[in-house]
C-alpha cells in the first residue's frame, strides 16, 4: 500500500499492534536499508456485536475522533471503522546562506513562518469468511480523504530585501482494496497464504505566490503552480510454509508488484507530464535448521527482476512561449531532453541468521542481509514542490538508480519474569548512495 495514503490516515484506535523486524529474512521485501514495521489492524475477536468510540483534543486545535464496530459468528467476522483528524501545525525557521566565490562572498538571510491546517477522514470496511476451521477468505476496503492548506511567509532581509507569501492547497484521496486467502491444512506445520492488493491514490495541489520587493516600490508579482499526482499499484503474492520435521522448516513464495506514478504539472502556464513505472517480479526461498537444541540457522535468498521506465514530456504548446531565463523552467526542460530512461535490472538478496540459546530465556543472534533502497516519488519527481523561493529550489531526478546496502547485526535478548532486556549492534555498508546534491549554479544551453 502507498505509505502516505495508508499510514497518514490510520488512527491509533484502529491499530491492534505494531510489529518491528529489524533485519527481516528473504520472505520480506528488501526495500529500505532499515527494518520492517508491520501494522496489524483490529478485526474483532469476541462473538456477537462489539464496538468502541474514542476521541482526543489538544493544543493548536488538534482533534481526532475514532469509532470501530465488529460482528463475529462461527462463519463470519464483519468489521468497520471511521476516523477524522484535524489540527494546526505552526513552524518558524531562520536560514543564513553564505556563498563563496573566487571574486567575492555573498550572504542571504531568511526568516520563515509556516502554518499548516491538515484534515483527514478515513473509513475502513471488511470481513472474514471461514469455510472450515482450517481456511479463511478476507476482504478489506479502506478509503482516505485528506485536505491540507498551507500559508508560508518568507522574509529575505539581505539587500535587496523581499517578502514572499505563498498559499497552497493539497487535496487528495485514496482507495485501497485487499483480498486474502489462508489455508492451514488442518495442522500447525503447514500454511498457504495468497493476497491481492489494489491501491489507487490521487493528489491535487495548487500554489499561489506573491512577492513584494524593495527594488521597485509596490511591486507585487504573482506566480501560480498546479500539479496533479496519481499513484497506483497492484500487488499479488503467494507464500507457503512447511515444517518438514522437528528440525527443518522451509518457506517459499513469489510476489509481483506493479507501480505507476504520474504527475501533470502546470508552471507559469507551461504544461509538463512525468510518468514513472516500476514492475517488480520476485521469488524467494528460505529454510530453518535447528542443528542442536541450542544452535540453529536460518538462511535464504530472494531473486528480483525489475523493470523501470521514466518519461518526461512537455506540451507542444510550451514551445510557443519559451522562458529560458526562468531557472525552474530551465531545470525541467533539461530533464525533458534526457527522456525516456529505461532501466531493467535483476538482483539476488541473500540473508543468513545464526541463533544461539544461552539458556531457555537468553539468546544471541547474528544476522546478515542485503537491502535495496529504491528512489521514492519525491526523489524522482523533477518538478519543484515549492516554487516561491528560487534561492532554495528542491527537485528530484527521474533517472535515479537504486542504492544497495549490506547489513550485519548482532542482538542479545533476555526474557525473565520481571525484566526483559534487548540490546543490539549493527553495521551497514551502503553503495551507490542516493543523496541530495547542493549546488548554487546551473547550466542551461551551455550557459552557467
What residue spans do the PLM features occupy?
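Outer-membrane beta-barrel signature, preferentially recognizing the C-terminal barrel domain
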Residues: 229, 272, 276, 340-343, ...
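Outer-membrane beta-barrel translocator domains and adjoining extracellular loop/strand segments
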Residues: 91-104, 150-158, 204-213, 217, ...
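N-terminal periplasmic accessory domains that precede
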Residues: 4-6, 20, 32-53, 65
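Transmembrane beta-strands of outer-membrane beta-barrel pores
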Residues: 55-61, 73, 84-88, 143-149, ...
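Short acidic/polar hinge/loop motifs at secondary-structure boundaries
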Residues: 2-22
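Transmembrane beta-barrel wall of Gram-negative outer-membrane proteins
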Residues: 61-88, 104-151, 172-177, 183
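Extracellular loop and loop/strand-boundary signature of outer-membrane beta-barrel proteins
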Residues: 52-54, 104, 108-113, 160-167, ...
